[in-house]
Amino acid sequence: MAAGPAPTGVYNVRDYGAKGDGKTLDSPAINAAIEAAVANGGGQVLLPAGTYLSGSIRMKSNVDLHITAGAKILAANPKKVKSADGTSVYDESESFGGFPEYQDGGHTYFHNSLIWAEGQTNISITGHGMIDGEGLTKKDTEKAGQVQGGSIGTGDKAIALKLCRQVTIRDITIYRGGHFGIIMTGCDLSTIDNVTIDTNRDGFDIDCCKYMTITNCKINTPSDDALVLKSSYALKKAVVTEHIAISNCNITGFKCGTMLDGTYIPEPVGWVCGRFKLGTESNGGYRNIALTNCTFMYSSGLAFEEVDQGKMENIVVSNITMSHVHHYPIYITTGCRNRGPKEVTEPSSARDIQISNVIADDCDSLCSIIVTGMPDVPIHNVWLSNIRLYFKGGGTRELVNKEYREQGTNYPEPKFAGWTPAYGLYARHVRGLHISDVTFRYERPDYRPAVVLDDVGDVTIHALDAPTEAGVEQVVTLSSETVPVIYD
């Protein structure tokens, strides 16, 4: 391998032996360029136009991995490509030594990824090039923290960063990102901007992070979560995810690859996600989260789930448009899955959630807006204002008397519970529910009430515009105080 040039601040990977022909394994040359930059205090590692077949790339402090327009990092298939010594092109999963049973393997192990870093500062991945995870697995191959034989030697994430600070990911495109396109755990003071991702599993997983902005991103994930915040036990302790600001993003659930090629083929109604979610891993909880000026199309909507004994509070959502909504537009829930240390006895909780200026059309009739707490620990203080939802309709009269399952220890996914008793809003175990300037409509006749409140107190409903069929009440209260609806 070539020795490389004198340090100039820019380290062209071709000067370190990279070919960029899509056939030669170039990750050793890329890693050599990174090490050369580090030896000289950092710099830009430049990938000019070409296709760079790669295994694991190890990011280091003060390095910018710059993938220029026309350049592609292509994840190698470990069954077809080996390192010079015959070993896997992907690094082995690191030793965890903590509590791997408290989160999925994808949240436990980072080194078995295409691009990874741990404990680094001031790193960036930039440029208008592409990361193509063709050779990555999209399976969670290390369930319950056990490195199974089938997972050894594979790469399962496009970008995996742990305990890093001052991270910037900007302008790149990720296609087929493996299990997670980007996972950042315990990474503070970071920015993701103008990133496009078109993948079959999770797009962005932001776990146990603080002080982060995510802006101007296009995220297409038909089979899993698009942009998900988590607070898992991956750092061997409960860490809150907080001070996260997300704006000007497009979230979709088109068939994988069709956002990038411009054909935009919708997936059929079924397990289509593409949603924005908090959870499910939620040991540390969430605080001070803002989502604004985002669009959703052919995807599920907003999901806020606290089920692992954390606290979810101070959540603000505004200026959201959705079209062709699968499963549900808005879902807020707490539960007691409690996947974490048994000595933690404090229950999950949620409070102070404000959602405003939302318009959504062609919403699946299976689920209304859902706000459900627990019998002994209700959700406190939810504001829903200036909301317009247009449903497909089709609900029957019998559904209002349906016993809608308690969340309890169940996995928090509304479609598993089936039809909601209301077509517009179903709330249970809530104290402080404030509805203002809300409109619901349906396309086909729907014989459910617009709103069903079960064990809900301190309710205000102001300017509710929600028609019902003849003989069907607009608002039904079950084990709740009677609620006056104020019309202007």
Summary of predicted features, one role per range:
Residues M1-D488:
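Extracellular/periplasmic carbohydrate-active domains that bind, remodel
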